[in-house]
């Protein structure tokens, strides 16, 4: 069996069906004796260019180990499913199990966002306490 990285884009109007599609595709691979090494749902993202007047798509990435037969069946499913607007299958030398760069970048962004929000909240709380103390002193 060979290792593959599969990315497919789902039409944004069909985003709610992504879970079922992923389940169906993973079942197809596992029933043929294959393995899912990594599954990442990147969510809705802006496309670099419009595809059939669609500017956003739901991205899903799979790293799998499967037979050629299972891969051909998966590609047929992509081809005949109108919700899948693009797909890419890349053969890999070995299984990739770590997080993708896309997911790492997203986590870094969310961590930075949280750090930016925390100091503002701490400063506003400190500022409120000092103001209330000043007003208490003014009353005395």
Curated annotation (Swiss-Prot):
Residues 96-140 are annotated as: Disordered. The keyword Aminoacyl-tRNA synthetase does not apply. Residues 103-121 have a biased composition (Basic and acidic residues). Keywords: Ribonucleoprotein, Ribosomal protein, RNA-binding, rRNA-binding. Pfam families: Ribosomal_S6. One of its GO terms (biological process) is translation. GO terms for cellular component: cytosolic small ribosomal subunit. The keyword Transport does not apply. Residues 123-140 have a biased composition (Acidic residues). One of its GO terms (molecular function) is structural constituent of ribosome. Binds together with bS18 to 16S ribosomal RNA. Belongs to the bacterial ribosomal protein bS6 family. This is Small ribosomal subunit protein bS6. The lineage of its organism: Bacteria, Pseudomonadati, Pseudomonadota, Gammaproteobacteria, Pseudomonadales.
